[in-house]
């Protein structure tokens, strides 16, 4: 991986397995898939990567990261919010998420208050340094926006948009006037043509109904999360709330791996109920080793695993919640392993999606037609010589790369 971030040469992914069971070659030219054919049928003048033993998937995306506080859980005392410190942490966090497969990250950043715009400055610097490796979008999240105390927050939010924040965030649960807070966010977003991402626990049906009614129809769209409080509503109330969210076209972002800064409640909303009502549900990581979750991993495949194991989704639906559906919620182009689609891909060692979600150790990540990250794992067992061979003890390792430079 010695190419500069801006370069994209021809690339052939050979012998990969798709979720439908086919073994294929995938030829990539620039940032898009040029051709898909039966394994062994395609050639290239560029680099060939041997993906025998790997499952090839559309790359996931991260809809809810906290870049300004990431990797601060072990800090002695309050974490630094100096731009240079935030830039370093945000860069490290985004690269960790990239190694897991996320080629796009929506990063929430607090603005205003004692920190001012320093954390946003750091995250925007990280975005620039990561260009060509991953797409990092900053969400400016204010605290108060109403009353005398909210004037500074509203000014900071406007300044954040001028600096380059790509999404307008909000925290209506933290404002004495949640409706006024939401109205201020939506007005600013409409004026600039930006999407909205609101932090809410979703445990107050009346408040959520007002918020949903206000947000409905806004383009390019509104996300709400983590909405853990929805799981605490009585069944009929939860069903009515789900119907309102679906009618408004609002996306619910759940965090199955844990909590995040600013959320009072832990847990996951009723994912199957929301999906049955027609709500678009996506899954994110939330806190990444900060005060809210000191053991956060930032791994979208773990989020998918938890949706499958804890929420009863099929492996396919669970993975779509961190990949295709998330990309749609973030306004990103759709990805399929077909000619003409963006070359945003994740190869995971395994022969099926369920196995990949369970034991997704070795991974290869492709962003804009380039291999941008590799993680290789080898599993071995201590044996007693011939007995190991006789019993066929499993070993996970890298396939023979051959002369063409496989993984």
Mark where each language-model region is.
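C-terminal helical cap
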Residues: 15-16, 21, 97, 249-251, ...
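Divalent metal-coordination and catalytic microenvironments
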Residues: 16, 31, 53, 64, ...
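Active-site core of metal-dependent hydrolases
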Residues: 142, 146-148, 161-266
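His/Asp/Glu-enriched, well-ordered alpha-helical/loop segment
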Residues: 195, 216-220, 269-348
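Histidine-rich, glycine-flanked metal-binding segment
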Residues: 1-58
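C-terminal cap of metal-dependent C-N hydrolases
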Residues: 337-407
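Alpha-helical scaffold segments that flank or form the walls of functional sites
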Residues: 54-56, 60-62, 71-108, 114-131, ...
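Histidine-centered catalytic micro-motifs
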Residues: 59-70, 195-203
